[in-house]
Amino acid sequence: MRSAQVYRWQIPMDAGVVLRDRRLKTRDGLYVCLREGEREGWGEISPLPGFSQETWEEAQSVLLAWVNNWLAGDCELLQMPSIAFGVSCALAELADTLPQAANYRAAPLCNGDPDDLILKLADMPGEKVAKVKVGLYEAVRDGMVVNLLLEAIPDLHLRLDANRAWTPLKGQQFAKYVNPDYRHRIAFLEEPCKTRDDSRAFARETGIAIAWDESLREPDFAFVAEEGVRAVVIKPTLTGSLEKVREQVQAAHALRLTAVISSSIESSLGLTQLARIAAWLTPDTIPGLDTLDLMQAQQVRRWPGSTLPVVEVDALERLL
Protein backbone atom coordinates (compact mmCIF):
# COMPACT_ATOMS: atom_id res chain seq x y z
CA MET A 1 0.00 0.00 0.00
CA ARG A 2 1.47 3.35 -1.06
CA SER A 3 0.98 6.72 0.63
CA ALA A 4 2.70 10.08 0.28
CA GLN A 5 2.93 13.55 1.76
CA VAL A 6 4.19 16.77 0.21
CA TYR A 7 5.23 19.71 2.40
CA ARG A 8 6.03 23.32 1.53
CA TRP A 9 8.52 25.25 3.64
CA GLN A 10 10.36 28.54 3.97
CA ILE A 11 13.47 29.19 6.08
CA PRO A 12 14.68 32.74 6.93
CA MET A 13 18.25 33.38 5.78
CA ASP A 14 20.99 35.42 7.37
CA ALA A 15 21.01 39.01 6.16
CA GLY A 16 24.17 38.82 4.04
CA VAL A 17 23.29 36.05 1.56
CA VAL A 18 23.52 37.36 -2.03
CA LEU A 19 23.09 35.19 -5.15
CA ARG A 20 23.81 36.71 -8.56
CA ASP A 21 23.24 40.25 -7.26
CA ARG A 22 19.99 39.21 -5.53
CA ARG A 23 19.62 39.18 -1.77
CA LEU A 24 18.19 35.84 -0.65
CA LYS A 25 15.88 36.58 2.28
CA THR A 26 14.32 33.11 2.54
CA ARG A 27 15.07 29.62 1.24
CA ASP A 28 11.91 28.11 -0.19
CA GLY A 29 11.30 24.50 -1.09
CA LEU A 30 9.32 21.29 -0.85
CA TYR A 31 9.70 17.89 0.75
CA VAL A 32 8.21 14.69 -0.53
CA CYS A 33 7.74 11.68 1.76
CA LEU A 34 6.91 8.38 0.06
CA ARG A 35 5.72 5.33 2.01
CA GLU A 36 5.25 1.76 0.90
CA GLY A 37 4.36 -0.75 3.59
CA GLU A 38 6.74 -0.16 6.49
CA ARG A 39 9.32 1.66 4.38
CA GLU A 40 9.71 5.42 4.00
CA GLY A 41 11.77 7.76 1.83
CA TRP A 42 12.27 11.53 1.90
CA GLY A 43 13.45 13.95 -0.75
CA GLU A 44 14.02 17.71 -0.94
CA ILE A 45 13.03 19.81 -3.94
CA SER A 46 14.45 23.32 -3.55
CA PRO A 47 15.27 25.10 -6.84
CA LEU A 48 18.01 27.70 -6.30
CA PRO A 49 16.95 31.22 -7.38
CA GLY A 50 19.17 32.57 -10.14
CA PHE A 51 20.65 29.14 -10.87
CA SER A 52 17.78 26.67 -11.35
CA GLN A 53 15.74 26.88 -14.55
CA GLU A 54 12.55 26.09 -12.63
CA THR A 55 10.95 28.06 -9.78
CA TRP A 56 9.66 26.29 -6.70
CA GLU A 57 6.10 27.21 -7.71
CA GLU A 58 6.62 25.38 -11.03
CA ALA A 59 8.27 22.51 -9.20
CA GLN A 60 5.32 22.28 -6.81
CA SER A 61 2.73 21.66 -9.54
CA VAL A 62 4.92 19.09 -11.31
CA LEU A 63 5.74 17.31 -8.03
CA LEU A 64 2.10 17.05 -6.96
CA ALA A 65 1.17 15.56 -10.34
CA TRP A 66 4.07 13.09 -10.14
CA VAL A 67 3.11 11.98 -6.60
CA ASN A 68 -0.47 11.32 -7.66
CA ASN A 69 0.80 9.23 -10.58
CA TRP A 70 3.16 7.35 -8.25
CA LEU A 71 0.29 6.59 -5.89
CA ALA A 72 -1.54 5.11 -8.90
CA GLY A 73 1.43 2.86 -9.67
CA ASP A 74 3.19 4.97 -12.31
CA CYS A 75 6.81 6.13 -11.93
CA GLU A 76 7.82 8.15 -14.99
CA LEU A 77 11.14 9.99 -15.20
CA LEU A 78 11.18 13.70 -14.41
CA GLN A 79 13.04 16.36 -16.40
CA MET A 80 13.23 19.29 -13.94
CA PRO A 81 16.59 18.81 -12.17
CA SER A 82 15.46 19.77 -8.65
CA ILE A 83 12.45 17.43 -8.77
CA ALA A 84 14.41 14.63 -10.43
CA PHE A 85 16.98 14.85 -7.64
CA GLY A 86 14.55 15.06 -4.72
CA VAL A 87 12.27 12.31 -6.01
CA SER A 88 15.21 10.01 -6.79
CA CYS A 89 16.47 10.47 -3.20
CA ALA A 90 13.03 9.59 -1.82
CA LEU A 91 12.82 6.52 -4.05
CA ALA A 92 16.38 5.49 -3.10
CA GLU A 93 15.59 5.76 0.62
CA LEU A 94 12.41 3.80 0.03
CA ALA A 95 14.38 1.04 -1.73
CA ASP A 96 17.25 1.28 0.81
CA THR A 97 19.76 1.96 -1.98
CA LEU A 98 21.10 5.27 -0.60
CA PRO A 99 23.79 4.23 1.90
CA GLN A 100 23.45 5.56 5.45
CA ALA A 101 27.17 6.31 5.88
CA ALA A 102 27.78 10.05 5.53
CA ASN A 103 30.73 12.40 5.06
CA TYR A 104 29.97 15.31 7.36
CA ARG A 105 33.39 16.88 6.88
CA ALA A 106 32.83 20.18 5.13
CA ALA A 107 35.25 22.64 3.58
CA PRO A 108 34.42 25.71 5.70
CA LEU A 109 33.43 28.90 3.91
CA CYS A 110 35.89 31.65 4.81
CA ASN A 111 35.14 35.35 5.00
CA GLY A 112 38.80 36.32 4.62
CA ASP A 113 39.72 36.50 8.32
CA PRO A 114 42.68 34.13 8.92
CA ASP A 115 42.13 34.04 12.70
CA ASP A 116 38.52 32.94 12.19
CA LEU A 117 39.61 30.28 9.70
CA ILE A 118 42.36 28.95 11.99
CA LEU A 119 39.70 28.38 14.67
CA LYS A 120 37.41 26.58 12.20
CA LEU A 121 40.24 24.35 10.99
CA ALA A 122 41.61 23.50 14.45
CA ASP A 123 39.26 20.54 14.92
CA MET A 124 39.37 19.41 11.29
CA PRO A 125 41.00 15.98 10.98
CA GLY A 126 43.36 15.31 8.09
CA GLU A 127 43.64 17.66 5.15
CA LYS A 128 42.99 21.35 5.86
CA VAL A 129 40.65 22.57 3.12
CA ALA A 130 38.58 25.76 3.04
CA LYS A 131 36.53 27.61 0.44
CA VAL A 132 36.62 31.30 -0.42
CA LYS A 133 34.18 33.13 -2.68
CA VAL A 134 36.03 35.49 -5.00
CA GLY A 135 34.69 37.85 -7.63
CA LEU A 136 32.35 39.69 -5.26
CA TYR A 137 34.86 42.51 -4.64
CA GLU A 138 37.86 43.89 -6.51
CA ALA A 139 40.11 41.19 -7.99
CA VAL A 140 43.18 42.77 -6.39
CA ARG A 141 41.55 42.56 -2.95
CA ASP A 142 40.64 38.92 -3.58
CA GLY A 143 44.24 38.14 -4.51
CA MET A 144 45.56 39.80 -1.36
CA VAL A 145 43.08 37.93 0.88
CA VAL A 146 43.91 34.55 -0.69
CA ASN A 147 47.64 35.23 -0.40
CA LEU A 148 47.23 36.23 3.26
CA LEU A 149 45.35 33.03 4.09
CA LEU A 150 47.87 30.78 2.33
CA GLU A 151 50.75 32.61 4.01
CA ALA A 152 49.18 32.47 7.49
CA ILE A 153 48.26 28.74 7.36
CA PRO A 154 51.10 26.76 5.72
CA ASP A 155 49.19 23.45 5.42
CA LEU A 156 46.03 25.07 4.01
CA HIS A 157 44.58 24.20 0.61
CA LEU A 158 41.95 26.58 -0.75
CA ARG A 159 39.03 26.02 -3.07
CA LEU A 160 38.06 29.27 -4.74
CA ASP A 161 34.83 30.07 -6.57
CA ALA A 162 34.52 33.05 -8.92
CA ASN A 163 31.15 32.17 -10.53
CA ARG A 164 32.45 33.47 -13.89
CA ALA A 165 32.84 36.97 -12.45
CA TRP A 166 36.15 37.96 -14.06
CA THR A 167 37.30 39.29 -17.38
CA PRO A 168 40.77 38.04 -18.42
CA LEU A 169 42.23 41.31 -17.09
CA LYS A 170 40.62 40.88 -13.68
CA GLY A 171 41.88 37.28 -13.55
CA GLN A 172 45.42 38.53 -14.15
CA GLN A 173 45.00 41.22 -11.48
CA PHE A 174 43.97 38.52 -9.00
CA ALA A 175 46.88 36.22 -9.85
CA LYS A 176 49.41 39.05 -9.63
CA TYR A 177 48.79 39.30 -5.89
CA VAL A 178 49.07 35.56 -5.17
CA ASN A 179 52.65 34.46 -4.53
CA PRO A 180 53.65 31.92 -7.24
CA ASP A 181 55.08 29.73 -4.45
CA TYR A 182 51.59 29.43 -2.92
CA ARG A 183 49.57 28.81 -6.08
CA HIS A 184 49.94 25.02 -5.94
CA ARG A 185 47.94 25.16 -2.67
CA ILE A 186 44.94 26.52 -4.53
CA ALA A 187 43.20 23.17 -5.00
CA PHE A 188 41.16 24.72 -7.80
CA LEU A 189 39.39 27.91 -8.82
CA GLU A 190 35.83 27.34 -10.06
CA GLU A 191 34.95 29.03 -13.35
CA PRO A 192 37.18 32.12 -13.05
CA CYS A 193 36.07 33.85 -16.28
CA LYS A 194 32.91 34.50 -18.23
CA THR A 195 33.79 31.98 -20.97
CA ARG A 196 35.40 28.55 -20.82
CA ASP A 197 38.12 29.61 -23.26
CA ASP A 198 39.08 32.56 -21.05
CA SER A 199 39.12 30.27 -18.01
CA ARG A 200 41.40 27.80 -19.83
CA ALA A 201 43.73 30.69 -20.74
CA PHE A 202 43.73 31.83 -17.10
CA ALA A 203 44.88 28.36 -15.99
CA ARG A 204 47.63 28.22 -18.62
CA GLU A 205 48.95 31.70 -17.87
CA THR A 206 48.84 31.57 -14.06
CA GLY A 207 49.46 27.90 -13.25
CA ILE A 208 46.33 27.99 -11.04
CA ALA A 209 44.17 24.90 -11.60
CA ILE A 210 40.52 25.44 -12.45
CA ALA A 211 37.29 23.50 -11.97
CA TRP A 212 34.09 23.36 -13.99
CA ASP A 213 30.78 24.04 -12.25
CA GLU A 214 28.20 25.96 -14.33
CA SER A 215 29.74 24.44 -17.47
CA LEU A 216 28.50 20.96 -16.51
CA ARG A 217 24.93 22.13 -17.04
CA GLU A 218 25.49 23.57 -20.53
CA PRO A 219 24.35 21.49 -23.52
CA ASP A 220 27.73 21.57 -25.29
CA PHE A 221 29.77 20.41 -22.27
CA ALA A 222 31.72 17.17 -22.60
CA PHE A 223 33.95 15.41 -20.09
CA VAL A 224 37.46 15.58 -21.56
CA ALA A 225 40.92 15.75 -20.00
CA GLU A 226 42.30 19.28 -20.37
CA GLU A 227 45.50 20.92 -19.21
CA GLY A 228 44.86 23.05 -16.14
CA VAL A 229 41.46 21.51 -15.33
CA ARG A 230 41.64 19.61 -12.05
CA ALA A 231 38.08 19.16 -10.78
CA VAL A 232 34.35 19.28 -11.41
CA VAL A 233 31.88 20.60 -8.85
CA ILE A 234 28.58 18.72 -8.96
CA LYS A 235 25.49 20.32 -7.44
CA PRO A 236 22.82 17.59 -7.46
CA THR A 237 19.86 19.98 -7.06
CA LEU A 238 20.95 21.64 -10.32
CA THR A 239 22.03 18.39 -11.99
CA GLY A 240 19.11 15.98 -11.77
CA SER A 241 18.55 12.43 -10.61
CA LEU A 242 20.91 10.40 -8.45
CA GLU A 243 21.68 8.32 -11.54
CA LYS A 244 22.78 11.42 -13.47
CA VAL A 245 24.90 12.56 -10.51
CA ARG A 246 26.57 9.14 -10.38
CA GLU A 247 27.22 9.22 -14.15
CA GLN A 248 28.95 12.60 -13.85
CA VAL A 249 31.09 11.45 -10.92
CA GLN A 250 32.15 8.33 -12.84
CA ALA A 251 32.96 10.38 -15.96
CA ALA A 252 35.14 12.72 -13.88
CA HIS A 253 36.95 9.90 -12.09
CA ALA A 254 37.64 8.16 -15.41
CA LEU A 255 39.63 11.28 -16.40
CA ARG A 256 41.36 11.42 -12.99
CA LEU A 257 39.50 14.61 -12.14
CA THR A 258 38.40 15.36 -8.59
CA ALA A 259 34.60 15.31 -8.28
CA VAL A 260 33.19 17.44 -5.46
CA ILE A 261 29.58 17.04 -4.29
CA SER A 262 28.42 20.56 -3.48
CA SER A 263 25.46 22.28 -1.86
CA SER A 264 22.86 24.47 -3.57
CA ILE A 265 21.95 25.87 -0.14
CA GLU A 266 19.63 23.00 0.75
CA SER A 267 17.97 22.66 4.14
CA SER A 268 19.50 20.36 6.75
CA LEU A 269 17.45 17.44 5.40
CA GLY A 270 18.89 17.85 1.92
CA LEU A 271 22.39 18.50 3.25
CA THR A 272 22.42 15.25 5.24
CA GLN A 273 21.45 13.39 2.07
CA LEU A 274 24.24 15.14 0.15
CA ALA A 275 26.67 14.05 2.88
CA ARG A 276 25.54 10.45 2.30
CA ILE A 277 25.89 10.82 -1.47
CA ALA A 278 29.41 12.22 -1.00
CA ALA A 279 30.45 9.31 1.23
CA TRP A 280 29.03 6.88 -1.35
CA LEU A 281 30.29 8.37 -4.63
CA THR A 282 33.31 10.51 -3.63
CA PRO A 283 34.60 8.91 -0.40
CA ASP A 284 38.10 10.40 -0.66
CA THR A 285 36.99 14.00 -1.26
CA ILE A 286 35.71 16.56 1.23
CA PRO A 287 32.32 17.75 -0.06
CA GLY A 288 31.30 21.40 -0.30
CA LEU A 289 28.42 21.43 2.16
CA ASP A 290 29.22 24.26 4.60
CA THR A 291 26.05 26.29 3.95
CA LEU A 292 23.74 25.46 6.84
CA ASP A 293 24.88 28.44 8.90
CA LEU A 294 23.50 30.75 6.20
CA MET A 295 20.06 29.75 7.51
CA GLN A 296 18.29 30.44 10.79
CA ALA A 297 16.93 26.91 11.36
CA GLN A 298 17.27 23.22 10.56
CA GLN A 299 14.34 21.10 9.43
CA VAL A 300 13.21 17.49 10.05
CA ARG A 301 16.75 16.04 10.10
CA ARG A 302 19.62 17.50 12.09
CA TRP A 303 23.11 18.19 10.81
CA PRO A 304 25.50 16.70 13.40
CA GLY A 305 26.98 19.36 15.66
CA SER A 306 24.72 22.20 14.52
CA THR A 307 23.19 24.31 17.28
CA LEU A 308 20.50 25.82 15.05
CA PRO A 309 16.92 25.18 16.22
CA VAL A 310 15.10 22.33 14.48
CA VAL A 311 11.68 22.71 12.84
CA GLU A 312 9.86 19.38 13.07
CA VAL A 313 7.67 18.00 10.32
CA ASP A 314 4.44 18.81 12.18
CA ALA A 315 5.21 22.53 11.84
CA LEU A 316 5.50 22.43 8.02
CA GLU A 317 2.68 23.33 5.61
CA ARG A 318 1.26 20.12 4.19
CA LEU A 319 0.05 20.19 0.58
CA LEU A 320 -0.87 16.53 0.21
Curated annotation (Swiss-Prot):
CDD domains: OSBS. Keywords: Lyase, Magnesium, Menaquinone biosynthesis, Metal-binding. The keyword Lipoprotein does not apply. It holds the Pfam family MR_MLE_C. One of its GO terms (molecular function) is O-succinylbenzoate synthase activity. Pathway: Quinol/quinone metabolism; 1,4-dihydroxy-2-naphthoate biosynthesis; 1,4-dihydroxy-2-naphthoate from chorismate: step 4/7; Quinol/quinone metabolism; menaquinone biosynthesis. Belongs to the mandelate racemase/muconate lactonizing enzyme family. MenC type 1 subfamily. This is o-succinylbenzoate synthase.
